[in-house]
Every structure is written in C-alpha cells, then in structure tokens.
Amino acid sequence: MKLDYKSFELENELSTIDEMLVNCSANTDFQPLVPYNLRDGVMLSNKAAVVCLKLIYNHPNLSSETVKAYRIIDKVIYDAFRDNNNCTDVLHIGDYYVGIFYAPQTIDIDSVLDTMGILNAAVDILDIKFKNTMPISLSCVMAADFGEIMHSMDLAPYEGWQGAPINNAIALCNEVYSKCNDYYGATLITESIKINLKEEFASFFHAEWSSTDCPIKSYIEYVMNKVMHNWIKQNKA
C-alpha cells in the first residue's frame, strides 16, 4: 500500500472539520490508501525516516460524540501525512500514528520535519474545534528517527514493518508522555535525523533530551507550521 498524495490545505481542512462535526456519523468511512506494488519483501533499507505521533485524549466517556471525534481525527491526521509525497505508509494502532517516509536524500528529511509541523498544529486545531462542540481535549507528542527499516511481505496477505527507527520513535514518545503534561506538544528527533537536516532546521534543535529509556542521542523542541500556528493564536481562547 502507498498513501495517495493529497496537498494539505488549511482552509479545506477547517471546512471539512466543521462539516464533519455537524454531519459525520460514527460509521463514516474514508480510504486514504491505494494499492501499490512494493516489488519485493525487503524495501527501504537504510532509506527511511519514521515519525511517531502519540495522541493524548481527555474525554469523560466513550459516547457517540467521542466516536465522531475519532473519525475526524483520523481524517485530519491522515491528510497531514498524505501532504508529504515521500510518505509510504501510516500505521494506526490505538493512540499511535506511525508514518514511514522514503528518504534517501537530505532534502527528503527536511520535508519530514515540515510534516511534523503540520501534524502538531493539526492536533491543536482539532482541540480548539472540539472544545466548541464537545467535552474533549486533545494534545500529542511526536518523535522521529532515521535508519535501516524493512518492509516484509513474505506472509502475504499480511504485511509488516520492522526496524530500530520504529521502536526508537515509539519509545521516545512513550518516555515524553510519561512526564505528564510537561512536554505536551513536544517534537523529538534523534541524532540520525538532525545530522541529515539542512543547517537552518538542524540549528533549531539545540536542547538535548536526556533519555532514560532509549539509548540514542535525541533533541527536543516545539515544531509547528507557521500558517497554522497563526490560526491557532487567533482562535485559541
């Protein structure tokens, strides 16, 4: 499978969120994936960046309104990943979204950071929209790593992704999340991401994260898309 590319347009997303808040039923479906031939059982070795986003929910109960919120979150998060043409797949398990990015060149790593900025802002926008209509608050933490990764199709029709970058990104997200709300909205990148970023982006990550769970060097900052951040500042109560 490969993500069907779609440009992330803020005004379109805002309109879609508003429409789904009014009209979306709990069983509304969408399909962001299209069949794609990955050619063989091993792919993207040493050529993949991985982004893990862990959503943080606060809602009183699992009502029909909560289910509606989940559907809207799914739509917007997938749209943010789809904005990057290098995004090969997204794994959604529980509160985790894990994006796999084909990134053989430095400029592709830069685009992964752009996607993280969109994702972070998208979650804040959803939080604002939900607070106006339902008792749900939303935040996230994110982490990214780069390195050897393997896509396995040997057990077709079952597929899977394996590799240290996936484990590292998830572990870093969990560690930051365990610090309660001190770091909500934080973006972590590993050393292997930082050294492949252009200087303008790399210099932004100067605060090193002291990890106790993940034995790799990483850095923490708060990354957000500028246009979307301006909307958030204007609309946040």
Predicted feature descriptions by range:
Residues 1-40, 181-237:
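Intrinsically disordered, glycine/charged-rich C-terminal tails and inter-domain linkers
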Residues 2-13, 55-58, 99-104, 140-146, ...:
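Short low-complexity stretches enriched in small and charged residues
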Residues 14-24, 65-70, 109-115, 155-159:
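A generic short-segment signal for beta-strand/edge and adjacent turn/coil regions
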Residues 19-20, 26-27, 82-87, 141:
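Short secondary-structure boundary segments
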Residues 28-32, 68-71, 76-79, 119-124, ...:
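A short linear-motif detector with a strong N-terminal bias
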Residues 32-114:
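Catalytic NTP-binding/metal-coordinating core of nucleotidyl cyclase/transferase enzymes
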Residues 105-225:
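Catalytic beta-strand-to-alpha-helix segment of the class III nucleotidyl cyclase homology domain
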